[in-house]
UniProtKB/Swiss-Prot annotation:
Transfers the gamma-phosphate of ATP to the 4'-position of a tetraacyldisaccharide 1-phosphate intermediate (termed DS-1-P) to form tetraacyldisaccharide 1,4'-bis-phosphate (lipid IVA). This is Tetraacyldisaccharide 4'-kinase. One of its GO terms (cellular component) is plasma membrane. It comes from the Bacteria. Its EC number is 2.7.1.130. Pathway: Glycolipid biosynthesis; lipid IV(A) biosynthesis; lipid IV(A) from (3R)-3-hydroxytetradecanoyl-[acyl-carrier-protein] and UDP-N-acetyl-alpha-D-glucosamine: step 6/6. One of its GO terms (biological process) is lipopolysaccharide core region biosynthetic process. The gene is lpxK. The keyword Heme does not apply. Keywords: ATP-binding, Kinase, Lipid A biosynthesis, Lipid biosynthesis, Lipid metabolism, Nucleotide-binding, Transferase. NCBIfam families: lpxK. Belongs to the LpxK family.
Amino acid sequence: MASEAPPFWWDEPDWRALALAPAAWIYGRVSGRRLIRAVPPRVSLPVLCVGNFTVGGAGKTPTAIAFARGAIARGMKPGIVSRGYGGNYSGLHLVDPGHDGARHVGDEPLLLARHAAVALSPDRVKAAEYLKSLGCDFIIMDDGFQSARLHADFSLLVVDASRGIGNGRVIPAGPLRAPLTDQMRKTDALLCIGKGNGADFVIRQAARAGRPIYHAQLRPSSSATVAGRRWLAFAGIGNPDKFYESVRQAGGEVVETHSFADHYSFEPDDIRGLVDMARRQGLGLITTAKDHVRLATMPGVPPEFLSKLAVLDVDLEFDRTDALDHILDTVVERFKSRLHG
């Protein structure tokens, strides 16, 4: 079972954040110093890093998918490097969406592998070189910003507009993976996803640092099956409220919600409980594409449950129509400068 971020991380700082401040200071010193001082190894391919400032969901997966699609549309062959959070693979592995299970490789890599080749490895350089040997000519690094284990020609940091960076404190007092000032120094651009003012502070910091700021929305891609129906919506992702809002945007009525920890491994009792709750209230069951990947590759999940389970997927849409191409151009230009500089 995956661990869940403490709810107080996303509220105003309270006594818990204060009590954990000494530990957060130590963590921040170490993580910030590693980020600033690291000289990551390079590969002879353009590398785009899609990361975020905090633990938890911000929209990295649909962002990585959008860039994979964009690269393919330009005639490129992108490959995605991932650590495979939520799985248990420790070696170098090329994800096979037809045979791999989420418990083995993680749910996000399975989703990403529907769009591009995905190589899993703690050694991101080895993963990138392997993708190059397969003919890939553009690398998308899914997360890995703070670890600094592979040089990125462009680091795009994703933030959720409604949640922002929570209480603004570093782990374990808050959700930040390193002090914001240190992270911003290594950030090339900010992508704010959704509506809301929760990210106003980090947007101001990015503007003050002279970083480009892009905006995008997550649009439901399967509204026809959702609209006009009453749902029990459930999710085991970093920000389940964002998913519930997407169901509403697609025209569905969310009567009940059930949230699980991020990357949650469902048990048979969970499935029975959801089915019983939905049946009692006459509701349909709906979940995320990421949760569906985990459920569909779990042993023992009743086929009738999967056949009746609705899935709402989302696509990333930039507010500026030229934003995605502009970022891809920048990545390639920086790579060429690095190669010939």
